[in-house]
């Protein structure tokens, strides 16, 4: 009988060497034997559990293929599919959103929950830039619907992201927004036959520049939809990622009123008074209160975390995580993975996992760490709690003791109230993923810390306060936190 190594077999079966060794150690590969530290496997042996694996793959479409199993931080759908990287199939979201019939939709989810990747996926599916790119979707859920084949690559799509917009002044932030808008214009300019436009339309097109004023910038996307509708005969789709980033920058740096005025005008022109708009989808972390920027948008469908719409489209379900862990030989860790990274609730789904932490955990081959909690600056959360009242600090103590809080709050976040109302702080902590809803009755929410990863993050923050020389921690009971604090 001929034999081959577990590494060779792993390549043949398109799984990791760790997975093959796991099967060998559990007696799931007939005829396999260990010599020293190396497993030897019969050449002709069948892969164990193939039928069950395929059943799960069809049901949950968790794919870990190619030489590189996990792509950490890649938010480009085309790149993931082209390079056969780790991808949990979320393409049914395309069908769900399209069949909702909503003209303008806002979806809020915590950071690192696949918002950008899902918008990239929508762009690849609908955009004329990806015409005849069925290869990106073959074998995925959406491609099982033959009626959707004719929609692929059919529409002009304006894909704009505010994710990287940073600045300490209104002018600096506006300039970065302008750069993003210019890039979208240039992308279309490279494929449009400008001779088909009137002289006035070409002049309007040319007015878009990095130094355009706020009024021109606020009308720029509306202008582009008009031009694209005339050119293609299909009303464009607008995809706007991280819509709330400029507003957060405005809050941090004290130009809130100017930014609210601009974003309100931008939204009104682009999404309300725009007869050339086909569909629009916006994503963000927070749901800014309606009085700030959404007062004129009566037609927007807001899908917040408690909404039952698109419950599994962002983040990983428990089954998706289980299958993913099994494919890389880490299934034995599933209970601890649940303790660390589970706990996010969207609608009625209470078993949603943080995808960033899961992919980092797999990439690190089973090392537990606060991956998600370390991906952004927690300065705002830390500052607000540090400056908060004694009651707020006591509430944090209760949460860290594993208790639940009964609070009244609004999922719409009013930044103007953050330093004055504790309910606004709870709204922020919930929107950003640090708290989860255990129960909801009208405006009363039963809240608790999301998971162990979040608990460790908060204990680290508070421990740093104790090491500081000021009195910001004065209302905390030092002993309780230092005794239970988890080492960084």
Residue ranges with predicted function:
Residues 1-19:
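Polyanion-binding surface elements
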Residues 21, 25-26:
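Residue-level detection of the helix-turn-helix DNA-binding "recognition helix"
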Residues 28-55:
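Short helix-start
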Residues 62-488:
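Phosphate-binding site recognition
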Residues 2, 37-39, 156, 445:
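Short beta-strand micro-motifs in enzyme catalytic cores
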């Amino acid at each position: 009988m001929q034999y081959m190594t577990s590494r060779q077999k792993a390549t043949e079966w398109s799984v990791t060497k760790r997975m093959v060794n796991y099967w060998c150690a559990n007696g799931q590969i007939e005829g396999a034997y260990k010599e020293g530290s190396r497993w030897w496997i019969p050449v002709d042996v069948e892969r164990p559990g193939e039928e069950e694996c395929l059943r799960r793959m069809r049901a949950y479409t968790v794919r870990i293929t190619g030489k590189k199993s996990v792509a950490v931080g890649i938010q480009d759908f085309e790149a993931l599919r082209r390079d056969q990287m780790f991808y949990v199939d979320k393409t049914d979201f395309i069908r769900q959103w399209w069949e909702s019939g909503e003209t303008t939709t806002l979806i809020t989810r915590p950071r690192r929950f696949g918002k950008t990747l899902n918008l990239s996926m929508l762009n690849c599916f609908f955009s004329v830039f990806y015409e005849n790119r069925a290869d990106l979707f073959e074998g995925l859920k959406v491609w099982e619907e033959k009626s959707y084949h004719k929609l692929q690559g059919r529409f002009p799509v304006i894909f704009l992201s505010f994710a990287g917009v940073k600045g300490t002044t209104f002018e600096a932030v506006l300039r970065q927004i302008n750069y993003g808008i210019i890039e979208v214009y240039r992308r279309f300019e490279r494929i449009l036959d400008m001779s088909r436009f009137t002289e006035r339309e070409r002049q309007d097109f040319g007015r878009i520049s990095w130094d355009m004023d706020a009024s021109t910038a606020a009308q720029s996307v509306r202008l582009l939809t008009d031009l694209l509708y005339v050119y293609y005969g299909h009303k464009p789709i607008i995809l706007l990622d991280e819509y709330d980033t400029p507003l957060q920058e405005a809050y941090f740096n004290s130009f809130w009123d100017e930014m609210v005025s601009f974003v309100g005008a931008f939204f009104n022109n682009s999404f309300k008074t725009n007869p050339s708009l086909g569909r629009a989808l916006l994503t963000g972390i927070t749901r800014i209160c309606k009085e700030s920027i959404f007062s004129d948008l009566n037609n927007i469908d807001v899908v917040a975390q408690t909404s039952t719409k698109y419950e599994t489209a962002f983040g990983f379900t428990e089954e998706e995580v289980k299958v993913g862990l099994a494919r890389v030989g880490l299934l034995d860790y599933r209970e601890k993975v649940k303790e660390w990274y589970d706990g996010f609730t969207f609608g009625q789904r209470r078993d949603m996992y943080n995808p960033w932490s899961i992919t980092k955990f797999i990439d690190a081959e089973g090392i537990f760490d606060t991956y998600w909690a370390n991906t952004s600056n927690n300065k705002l959360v830390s500052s607000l709690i540090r400056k908060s009242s004694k009651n707020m600090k006591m509430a944090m103590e209760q949460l860290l003791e594993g208790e639940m809080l009964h609070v009244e709050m609004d999922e719409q976040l009013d930044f103007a109230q953050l330093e004055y109302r504790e309910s606004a702080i709870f709204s922020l902590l919930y929107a950003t993923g640090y708290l989860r809803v255990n129960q909801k009755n009208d405006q009363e929410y039963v809240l608790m810390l999301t998971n162990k990863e979040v608990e460790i993050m908060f204990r680290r923050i508070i421990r740093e306060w104790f090491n500081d020389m000021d009195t910001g921690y004065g209302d905390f009971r030092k002993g309780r936190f230092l005794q239970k604090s988890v080492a960084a």
